[in-house]
Amino acid sequence: MPPRKKPKSSALKSNKQSSANHSSQPSTFGIQQLFLRHIQNSQSTSNSHTSTADPVDQQNVNGLASDTAVLTPQNPLGTSNEKPDESKDMDQQLTEASPKISKNLKRFSPGMLIKQSQDDCGGEITWKISPVNERLRAAAKNIPKMMDLTENSLGVKSSTIRPCSLNKLVQKQCPTSGITSKVEQWLSSPSKKASKRPAFATNRVMERVNPSPDAEFEIVNTSSSGNSPFQTPPSLSCPHNKLPCTVTCSGACGSMGAGQHKKALLELLDQVEDVIAVDDKTTDDVGIVMPQARVKDDIISSVVDCAVDEGPVSLPKMQNSINPDSYFLVLEVSEKRGSGSSSKGQCPYKVLRLLDEHTGVECALYLWDEWFYSTVSPGDSINVIGEFDGDGKCDVDRQNNFLIVHPDTLVAGTRVAASFGCPRRTVLDERLRSNEHATVALLGTLQHQVFQAGLSQESPSVDGLQEYASTVIEKSIESLYACGVHEGDVRSTLFKAIPKMLNWIEHFRYSKDSEVSKVDFGSTIGKKAVKVSEVIDIEEMSWAPKYGLKGMIDASVRVIVESDMNTVNEKIMPLEFKSGKAPSGQSSIEHSAQVILYTLLMSERYLKHIDNGLLYYLQSDQTQGISVQRSDLVGLIIRRNELANDILVASTTQQLPPMLRNPNICRNCRHLDVCTIYHKADGGNTESSGLGDVFDTHVSHLSTLHFNFLRHWDRLIDLEGREMQLLRKDIAHPHGSKGSHSASYLSSMVLDVTNGFQHHNSHKETRFIYRFVRQKSSESRERVTSEDMIRTGNLATDDLDCKLRTGDRVILRTEVSHLTVANGIIADISRTHISVSLSKRLRLPWSEPSSEVSNLSHELWRIYKDEFMTSFSVMRFNLMQLFVQNGHNIRKMIVDLEPPRFDNGSILSQDPAISYIWSEKSLNNDQRQAILKILTAKDYALILGMPGTGKTSTMVHAVKALLIRGSSILLASYTNSAVDNLLIKLKAQGIEFLRIGRDEAVHEEVRESCFSAMNMCSVEDIKKKLDQVKVVASTCLGINSPLLVNRRFDVCIIDEAGQIALPVSIGPLLFASTFVLVGDHYQLPPLVQSTEARENGMGISLFRRLSEAHPQAISVLQNQYRMCRGIMELSNALIYGDRLCCGSAEVADATLVLSTSSSTSPWLKKVLEPTRTVVFVNTDMLRAFEARDQNAINNPVEASIIAEIVEELVNNGVDSKDIGIITPYNSQASLIQHAIPTTPVEIHTIDKYQGRDKDCILVSFVRSREKPRSSASSLLGDWHRINVALTRAKKKLIMVGSQRTLSRVPLLMLLLNKVKEQSGILNLLPGDLKP
């Protein structure tokens, strides 16, 4: 196996020694040692455990600083470790394609080491990495001017930080007469240099603080708004005979180690105070005077259990305005006692020290009454809906203002409403995507659609709605099949409901002749006459980051409300439709809560105060008015905050809310299996579950090994999911985003209205197509020539070079107002435009119909890839299926790693499938043996297909052999292109198949085999078709199609399995009794964004896990038909240990055919010489050094060289379609694209080229330095990617780079030596290139 760098120890990285992440063997031995090595190591590595390195291990520190090259099995090439002073530049690189992150000692903060505690209790505390360190520095960058604080303004040292107790609030007795205290001042100690190391997120969400029953508090509820059904914790009142005390905490109380690392966190804030400073000169004329907050000054500040008392100090006057659109970073949390405006006597309250992340201004927030119980910790993000006074203070209590915790976590209104019953169930709903299809839910959805259609029509009729109902049933025929219901029964149910729907529309739609219908809005407002004057939108997508909420509103309506005084008011309201009867009890509360939360969403979306909503129950034909009361909002927002906290705790610590412990409810819960398994994995038992034998039945079949596997992979999924949260934050709250271009979204897009808007009508639905183009560049930029951009490395961003692809789901958001408008699917994308398909017309909430087109075309748009809600929830669902009771077979293979079984006796039998394989002349011996391995497998088989060895052809013949046996087959891969490539070859063989997937994502050659193209009109037709077809194909994440709910297969074949993460691979395997994994784990591994997840094993595919555990299950394809001999020798020497061989003499001797050998340049003539199959163009004599375009790396000289070679190839008769260009960096790919704008050559990064090949491949390595240093940790040291780059060419491989720089990478040094053996190195001179 190719060499890997020797692992380095650090305060952040554990020293992993597990089967998932063991060291590789030297590349010179390569794949021939595969079987022996895994047989020797499988037992020992499978039992190893992860150990965490001591953050101050001196040995590790010395090891990091060492510059000695060590020759070990882990480091066979003697890779030198970098010295700290030499690696600074390398560490600052932000490579776009590399998953590698360089680690060295210089980037560690002193705060990561153990420090002596500052409190009087003695002992030591361990400094954790601060969750706010990086964000503080990011906030500092947004401050217009760096500002200095003098010693006079910062002279008081910060109070000693004390963790508050989870179990009780400690009171301290002090004399009261004549004593008044002021608000405690939080001023930092003398600043130190801020850490330069980016901080990883730590556990920033802790358990909720509950007062101990031992505390002498009187529980009171003095709500002035009346009783609310949404109960919140009561406030606490301090007895008058007890004096107030202060409890200051730097973290949430009661958390594991919170008191220690949160105190260290606060000390770290002191280090960065010189960055976050306030300059009086810059703020004299920008101050804003706000209404005074009701902060009482009769508070005595004291520190619990501490002999040091702090003197009363006042916060400085605010000199900077607080941006109302900013989020606040919580720096410190203190608990005190005092008098609030809504409470009598002394009561506890919290004070949050905040930092405005947009302006860098500090302020204070006071939480009273129910808000006192809010779980807030240093490092959390919050939003405050309210005003701060001139001193930067704000109160949140029963009567005033709101606190939104974790506003970037957008929680669905339906989730908040449902969480009152069981928070644990709601969190599981959020984290797991279930395959369940319920008839009741489906009928409700269909009735929703029919009712919404009636609302949208000007004159709805029974016949019209019945016709629409039939169309809706036809669209949902797959779901009907999954639920097992007949379309005739569903049609009958919908037809019966239509008269009631029309009756409601007739009574409540506004017209001069219609009768007045009154709606009861409750005791506060009473009955009001209501008429709907306009249906503004249906299924309106609404996100409100201000409140941390999102939702899809059934109908947004404009309503005319007539009062008793004959006055008329026009309002906008949400209309929520329920298909059942008006309930009572918990369900009624949930429905009301849902409508109330929708009023918040609409208030934010329409910039209006919306405080009423309508709730219509179809079966009971009852309409309720919902009037929003502050007491309800307080309870719901607190519940939303708790739920957001629960979701974040689950994603950071894998801890769920406690079980409900109610057998009557839990027995019927959809998550009973998952809930009990998680509880057991978290250390729970029968008694703590509260379910008795029911609990034991669901977990007794699992062992400690199983629970360890579950916890490990559950954590890895969450680590990877956290990386996606960064992009989610940009969608939810993009104010701080400065970049104009990102790989996962497009910015500065404008709607192209030159040809109007397109409509795509099918027999099932109408889609609206909107075409977007990049906003025109500025005039000055347009004058810059293409040559100028290439020479300077300065790129235009008009090209749509990103990760978005046809068929991807996307979110449309306005760039200026940051309004999320719609979601859709990419119908088409090119370098110049992107077309998005929507299910309804695109509209802006404030836009009038007459000006709709004009408003849309003048808006700037961002288009985000919507990849957050599906993949990770599917991964967790797949993972949990290994541990349910009926998952025994797949669990023993994947978790227990039991050896697979093979029926070798059948090879000699008269099986017609085996006879076919022996008789098929187009198969070589390797391919034949691989198919025989598949046919004899009882559990699973593994096919290791090296580059160009005909994996796809082998699978085609394997499918034909299995069909001869009468087997049913499920084909799957991670990408749509990989699935379609196989299906195209099956189609050429006349094999019938069913392709599951969206039309937009499927290749046009196989689109006719999609279910949507088959015009299935009945459940019976689906059953017949699925019984008839033997081959079904889907992506791994699309496997949850309703068509597969009741389907089982004999064999599942997964292509490109080496690139698929283990939890993703599990999904298709659940549908089959035997499976086949086809791949090559010596090429690209699964793409993992999180460094921590990758280091802990998430980059290890199921293919690799099983092949390392059981080499006997592998059948190797090593006869390749792609590369000529010279190119193949490179990969053999570096990766495969001479196991690859050419499949024929024609392949081995193939050369690039040129129509003419004439060339104006001698160096180009040498490069194009057909007998030179491998060429390395050395740029060391050209001073062709790398450049930086912001954080991206490119090389303008290499781009020019590539352009000249491509031009010469085309001039000499090589078709541009036979030429491919590969580079490790996106920025270089864009630069080369500008260098050859008129030549249609495929230019991609290495990751995008796996599975593709060309006659001639050019590789631009980019990296070139005047004084090169070791680059072992860079992208170029990733041997998987280098392997892919070298094995894409058929007849000629041309590499361009700096020999001096690349030689510092051990793997590339071997490559260059091998090229030198072939006399393939060509040194360019300064006069060789065109001027």
Swiss-Prot record:
Residues 40-52 have a biased composition (Low complexity). It holds the Pfam family AAA_12. It catalyses: ATP + H2O = ADP + phosphate + H(+). Transmembrane segments: none annotated. It is an enzyme of class 3 (hydrolase). Keywords: 4Fe-4S, ATP-binding, Chromosome, DNA damage, DNA repair, DNA replication, DNA-binding, Helicase, Hydrolase, Iron, Iron-sulfur, Metal-binding, Multifunctional enzyme, Nuclease, Nucleotide-binding, Nucleus. GO terms for biological process: DNA damage response; DNA repair; DNA replication; meristem maintenance. Its cofactor is [4Fe-4S] cluster. One of its GO terms (cellular component) is chromosome. Its EC number is 3.1.-.-, 3.6.4.12. This is DNA replication ATP-dependent helicase/nuclease JHS1. It comes from Arabidopsis thaliana (Mouse-ear cress). The gene is JHS1.
